[in-house]
Amino acid sequence: MPDDVGPAEAEVSGAVSESDNEYDETEATTKDDDEKMAERSAASEGVETNGDQKKKYDPKDPLRPRRKKARRACYACQRAHLTCGDERPCQRCIKRGLAEACQDGVRKKAKYLHDAPPEALRPVLGPNYNPAAAVSVRNGHRHPSNAGSDAGSSVGTFFSQSTQYPVFSSAATQLGSIPENLPFPQQSPVSPTFQASGNPQLGSIGVNSVSSPMNSFPPALFDPSNPAIFNFNLEGLNFGSQYGAMEFGMLGHMSSGAAETPPRDPSISQQGTAGDVGFNPSGVFGNGLNQFDKVYDNNTGLMSDFLTLDAHSSGLYSQGNLQHGLPHAYAIPAGPTSLQSPSTENNSPQPTGFGFESPTTTNYTGVPGAGGNQPGSQQSRTQKPKTPALGKLGPQSVLGKRQRDPSSIYEAVKEPFQYVASFHKLISLLQNRFSGASTISIVRSLASIRPSFMSCMKTLNRADLIFMEKSFQRALFEHEEFMHQSPSPAIACRRTGEIAGVNKEFTALTGWTKDVLLGKTLNLNANMGGTNSDTLSVSSKGGRGGIVGTTPRLKPLNPEQGPNADGQQQQSQQQKEQPQPVFLAELMDEASVTQFYEDYAQLAFTHSRGTVVRKCRLLKYRTQENMDAAAAAASSVPTTAGGSGSSNGTVVNGGPDSSPAGKTERERSTGANVASNSILSNRVAKIDGEHGISKLERDGKLECSYTWTIKRDVFDIPMIIMINFLPCYYRSHNQLAV
């Protein structure tokens, strides 16, 4: 009798176990968990649980044995909302008789992964995940045998021994005439550049025809932190840190779809078409140090072909006005062997024979009229004569690498800048050069912002002041690059008005050299903004224009100073002994400086993003020898009705010497040597020539329009003043247009 009861009990237990697979909302999951923990602990100790009483554990007991959470539940435990284990098959599936069908379940996809293809998530789901396997559930009954057979067959199909990764989706027919040993040297399989539905030739490529074995491919194929997943060549980008290069590369990767897809010539063979979508696994994780050597080779490189372009040649894929065939917009520079998706060799219209061919185009059978793909044309391109500019070019000059490291700023600055001493020098300069009314107006403007300076500076210590100077030098480092690339004359000043940066255009306009402005050489300027007689009167009357009744001069306590105790002579003697940076007040006339400091008082602390647009008069750099020579030349020239000599010795345009017949031999020789003595390069010799921007002056002054703004530091204190100038042209002044 007991033998007859055994199968019945087994059937009953099997039915009960089948019903346990179903999820019951009213059943408490904690009870089932406690039972499973008791069964597992008893099985580990070798205790028979068939006839023994199961030990109950209090769910609130802190000393009860806890189950280790699994990284991913199996399909059955996931549907039953039960805790699973890491082993496969798990203990619960073994007990229920579902050992063969036990596999990892499918998690719900996050919102940001809804657009990701399932293939991109497969390597992360573990080795037991089978997307094709599904346990059929109909009317509360399961079919474990069918599920197990389906799972066993499908798992073997996806994770076979020959690991082949498909390059394109298998939604097309097979393509014939593709050789087995087809090289794949260029593109990465994860590159989103090519779409299977957009190109009929590429869309017809099957999975098995293009797939190449990659047994050494690392498991972390879709690691977002790996820059190779988006083909970013961080070493080819001009960035000091990896984070900035990654962000810049991602922006270029997102904007790569703005360029047009290059047209395909129908005569190109299918072998060359498939070569564009190849993949070289050794190139993704290489350092890429030798990639740009091939680009900038003087004989066979890309720049050799680029510098020898014929402007009248028409390429195969010329687009209207874009005859040179370069791409519309590409933010990332790419070489012939680089791995970036927005590459100028693969994604842009390519004129043949101009050196912009992709390396994979050497596999093409031939394009009518394009001889750059044949080995003979490669040999002919190597025999092209060198251009003079090739010797100056290289990977560093073309990529625009920085010549100095900004980290040296933080190592060089050890002391804070003495702004108090600079303000005292500024007040002394204003008292010596300008009249009492202008000096008082400027001092009142500075006094209006003095409380704001004091409130911002009272909590700063020495470390803060050193950090303030480092911030200024770092900001000046960036602005100097902008000024060198700007076509307009520009200068950068401290908040005291001292010149800290200048470009070549300002030097060509005013004659003030960079060494004089930055205080590296002595300032020998004698042009104070007036005529010769006015300058002499200012010098003879103590530099105040003869105005009496203002702030008196205090005599020094040391009687040994002798005749230099007058103030201005003593200061001029000290300035000759020690060079110092030029103040902005020395570059403008009196009215312009007064107006500048009135605007400075309004813009220093009130409008953080405000700008000022005014007109001013810049002073040309004239030494005393130049002033005397110009005065002697002006006195020797007779005045006529057609023109008159200027007060500072410069002949006004329109006089007798302005005509070609009136030019002396010395002036002709000077004009012939302009290109060699030009402040700017030879390409803009006419701008810096006889009638260029260096000649736009009247009485030693330049009429200019200028705009400036203030950049503050982290303490909300004015840090750097950026000023841009543009010379004004007036026909009534008989000036010659540039």
Curated annotation (Swiss-Prot):
The keyword Protease does not apply. Residues 74-102 bind DNA. Residues 28-39, 51-64 have a biased composition (Basic and acidic residues). It is found in: Nucleus. The keyword Cytoplasm does not apply. PROSITE patterns: ZN2_CY6_FUNGAL_2 (PS50048). Residues 1-65, 255-278, 328-404, 530-579, 636-673 are annotated as: Disordered. GO terms for cellular component: nucleus. Keywords: Activator, DNA-binding, Gluconeogenesis, Metal-binding, Nucleus, Transcription, Transcription regulation, Zinc. SUPFAM superfamilies: Zn2/Cys6 DNA-binding domain. GO terms for molecular function: DNA-binding transcription factor activity, RNA polymerase II-specific; RNA polymerase II transcription regulatory region sequence-specific DNA binding; zinc ion binding. Disulfide bonds: none annotated. GO terms for biological process: cellular response to starvation; gluconeogenesis. Residues 475-546 form the PAS domain. Residues 568-579, 636-655 have a biased composition (Low complexity). It comes from the Eukaryota. Pfam families: PAS_13 (PF24990). Signal peptide: none annotated. InterPro entries: ERT1_acuK_gluconeogen_tf, PAS_13, Zn2-C6_fun-type_DNA-bd_sf, Zn2Cys6_DnaBD. Its main location: nucleus. Residues 337-351, 530-540 have a biased composition (Polar residues). Transcription factor which regulates nonfermentable carbon utilization. Activator of gluconeogenetic genes. Belongs to the ERT1/acuK family. This is Transcription activator of gluconeogenesis SMAC_06113. It comes from Sordaria macrospora (strain ATCC MYA-333 / DSM 997 / K(L3346) / K-hell).
